[in-house]
């Protein structure tokens, strides 16, 4: 029997909007090659081959990153522009209707990992929160599936150019 690649999805308990989309999809097409696990507690995520960290609002430390072979995150901006928090919301507030979605490796610095894959979300400008989240989830799932299809043959591309940073949003934004 061929050993399956162990995949974990880590969600933030307080920001787990994407977990329902991911769990609903189930990635059945990939079950022969991968085993999938879902977590909201980072302390339970150890010794995985791939960890997708989605909607997570906390910074993960070096110890966590070293416990797993490959940690990945989806970030919705044209990196290195727009590193940081709530990039979709900040860009919508700036009237951007095409937003880049990146699958990146994680290192110890916020959103500074190498880019693996990219796609684009297009907005009309009149979407409500649920529709925005649906488009984000759809783009994220497509990037994850594209990555899984290519794995272990993927290319890391360094981020280039001037960087900008989005601060955390608060109740006054």
Q: What residue spans do the PLM features occupy?
A:
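One-carbon transfer enzymes
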Residues: 1-173
């Amino acid at each position: 029997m061929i050993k399956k690649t162990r995949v974990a999805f880590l969600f933030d308990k307080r920001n787990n909007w994407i977990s329902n989309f991911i769990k609903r999809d189930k990635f059945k097409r990939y079950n022969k090659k991968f085993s999938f696990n879902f977590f909201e507690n980072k302390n339970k995520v150890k010794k995985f081959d791939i960890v997708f960290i989605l909607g997570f609002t906390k910074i993960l430390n070096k110890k966590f990153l070293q416990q797993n072979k490959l940690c990945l995150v989806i970030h919705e901006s044209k990196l290195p522009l727009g590193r940081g928090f709530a990039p979709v919301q900040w860009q919508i507030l700036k009237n951007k209707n095409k937003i880049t979605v990146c699958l990146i490796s994680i290192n110890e610095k916020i959103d500074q990992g190498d880019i693996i894959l990219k796609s684009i979300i297009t907005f009309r400008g009149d979407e409500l929160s649920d529709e925005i989240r649906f488009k984000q989830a759809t783009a994220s799932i497509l990037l994850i599936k594209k990555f899984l299809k290519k794995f272990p043959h993927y290319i890391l591309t360094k981020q280039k150019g001037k960087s900008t940073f989005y601060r955390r949003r608060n109740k006054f934004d």
